[in-house]
Amino acid sequence: MVQSIDINKKLESILDKEEIKNNILMKNYTSFKVGGPADIFVTPNSYEKVKGVINICKENNIPYFILGNGSNVLVRDGGIRGVVVSFNKLNKVYAEGNKVIAESGTLLSMVANTALKSDLTGLEFAHGIPGSVGGAVTMNAGAYNGEISQVIESATVIDNNGKIIKLSKEELDLSYRNSIILKNGYVVLNATFALQKGDHDAIKGRMDDLMRRRKEKQPLEYPSAGSTFKRPEGYFAAKLIEDSGLKGTHVGDAEVSIKHSGFLINKGKASAKDILDLIEVVKKTVKEKFNVELNTEVRIVGEESEN
């Protein structure tokens, strides 16, 4: 465990006391509803504070983890050592002409709704994706034939030298669930989306239709991290899992959803270990049946529990 008292003192030089908490259970901050405690959990409310926290961590060899909405993260039962930097206070979003500018902690659904209010089309696919802007840009999030790379103009990030820089769409090097941000460990502060003027009712109709399809086909009533696995080249992960006879397979309260086999869900009291063990069952079975390697889309972080 990180010596929290020493680091707390350093963090208090740039953060307000209420922006620093200790031993916070991560299950309360992830959509899977699992995860042990973070040593230190901070909620900076400005870019300079984020930059300062990261600099303190680097100077003191303290590991840090950037947390958005926690919707694509699986935190192990032992929790996270070091500092978790939550972006939930950095959530401003506004439209300016044909563009929408959003801070990293803004929910994608809020970004889509902001576009709708200004009759801007292009972000309908993002309505209903549970993530925030930072994670969405980092992973080039997408759904229903839309993805971030189609609409992003630029992103402001903290680079590895601790500098705040602006990256163009080309510099972001977005590909399937990947980007220069993910490769280099940059931290997203905000993003600008370039959209088109459209018909308000048509935009709302598409958003409503996609939400209806999500509710019909996805187990939104249970905690999950959305699609657990990346799409293998030439295949669909959900179909491979279903054709392997794995629907309804469970380890403890972790289950392969009967509604959508691409989702692993928490039926109530699953531990992170239950979910991780189920991931291994799925990967092993699909490999044996189809000789296809499944890779997780969800980010797995933290320490194993000592119990």
Swiss-Prot record:
Its EC number is 1.3.1.98. Residues 33-198 form the FAD-binding PCMH-type domain. Pathway: Cell wall biogenesis; peptidoglycan biosynthesis. Its cofactor is FAD. InterPro entries: FAD-bd_PCMH (IPR016166), FAD-bd_PCMH-like_sf (IPR036318), FAD-bd_PCMH_sub1 (IPR016167), FAD-bd_PCMH_sub2 (IPR016169), MurB (IPR003170), MurB_C (IPR011601), MurB_C_sf (IPR036635), Oxid_FAD_bind_N (IPR006094). One of its GO terms (molecular function) is FAD binding. It catalyses: UDP-N-acetyl-alpha-D-muramate + NADP(+) = UDP-N-acetyl-3-O-(1-carboxyvinyl)-alpha-D-glucosamine + NADPH + H(+). It is found in: Cytoplasm. Pfam families: FAD_binding_4, MurB_C. One of its GO terms (biological process) is regulation of cell shape. Its main location: cytoplasm. The keyword Ubl conjugation does not apply. The active site is at R177, S227 (proton donor), E297. It is an enzyme of class 1 (oxidoreductase). GO terms for cellular component: cytosol. Keywords: Cell cycle, Cell division, Cell shape, Cell wall biogenesis/degradation, Cytoplasm, FAD, Flavoprotein, NADP, Oxidoreductase, Peptidoglycan synthesis. HAMAP family: MurB. Cell wall formation. NCBIfam families: murB, PRK13905.1. Belongs to the MurB family. This is UDP-N-acetylenolpyruvoylglucosamine reductase. It comes from Clostridium novyi (strain NT). The lineage of its organism: Bacteria, Bacillati, Bacillota, Clostridia, Eubacteriales.
